[in-house]
Amino acid sequence: MKLSKLNIKKINFNDIDINYSSQDILMKLGELYQFESGIYGYGNIWTKLERNIEKIIIEELDKADCIQVEFPKLQPRSIWDKSNRWNQYTEENDIMFHIKNNFGEYGLAPTAEECATIFGANRLLSYKQLPTTYYQIGEKFRKEIRARGYLFRPRTFVMMDAYSFDKDEENMHKTFNKMHNVYMNIFKRIGINIVPVISDGGTMGGRVSEEFQAITKLGEDIILYDKNTNIGINKEVLSFKDKETFINKLNGISLNKMEEVNSVELGNNFELGTKYSDLMEMYYQDENGNNKPFYMGCYGIGLGRIIATIIENNVLIKDEKIKGFVIPYNVAPYKVHIVYSEQNKDNAIELYERLLENNIQCIIDDRDNLILGNKINDVALLGTPKLIVLGNKYDNINYEIEDLKTGEKDIVKKENIINYFR
């Protein structure tokens, strides 16, 4: 990508929102645009980062034999009435955007249990087809009364939501545990240290829900965290009468070894049991030809929150001043940022074209109106993890590659540059 094509704006770092500096930088660059509170448009950097995260999510879900589908975002009231959730979501909790016209009443999907149940029951007619898990990645809508933190709590957002179908409770537990492992693999590949947080859902008999939290000072949630096991517990556990017994079952951890930390929820898994299958009268046939309800689970990952967490947890500070942010290499939209002095313009273009020919995504700062020093100062604005400077000391033999996160530098011969980035 030629930087001149991004048309980024000039930034005044004295005017940065220090609480959400990375997202505010993208706002001021024009790479994130707020149409209204909680409603955003996304530029090149955010969109490419989202696609890279999507790719990892899809790969891990597909490896686990999950099936990608797509449900409608505009959903008729009739299916929500079947689950008794229309009034809950439009009046009691007032979460769902909804409309009424000549065709009927509709809601903009905040979630998709109803669609998934109907879709699954229409296809999964026999116990022989179970277990099956469907997933989709797309936009969701929620009437957040207090939209805040840019993409930490917006009104429209992209998420992955999955829905599993099993024949009995035992197999539902197996799927739940399998999805736990899938999630841990996803977050590991993305580059986020995720904390599985046990949430008992009000009963002490077994794990029926689980959150995947990232520790960050910007998080609204407060969890109890054990560093040695990397396990978290919701503070609601403290209200349980036999809380010590419950906690001690979790790898022997103890309350007095846990600390309170701020965190943000990036994903969650729930065992739904037969709730939706029973309410909506959706069944499969068992070995004896009898109709039986599906045991279901639902699983969600918020892509916008993941991106917000990544860039806010990787702010680049030099000389006690915010300079930008650095995106982890695995998911970075552009792996390397090339800047050059005028005398090395041809060499820089040659490097840029070589990298692109080998499918290595990179940025070249081709803005001829800026001197080299100003170009270097702008490198961290777009989150690129690696920097190559072709300045006056460049010898046309070796490239000096700087890791913007650590400051470490590698010297790589020209002929080895492609292998370095692979």
Q: PLM ranges: what are they?
A:
Residues 1-363, 367, 392-422:
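TRNA-recognition modules of translation machinery and tRNA-sensing kinases, especially anticodon-binding
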Residues 370-371:
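Interaction modules related to DNA damage response and DNA replication/repair
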Residues 383:
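A short alpha->beta transition loop at the rim of the catalytic pocket in nucleotide-sugar-dependent
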Residues 374-376:
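Short beta-alpha junctions and helix-cap segments that line functional grooves
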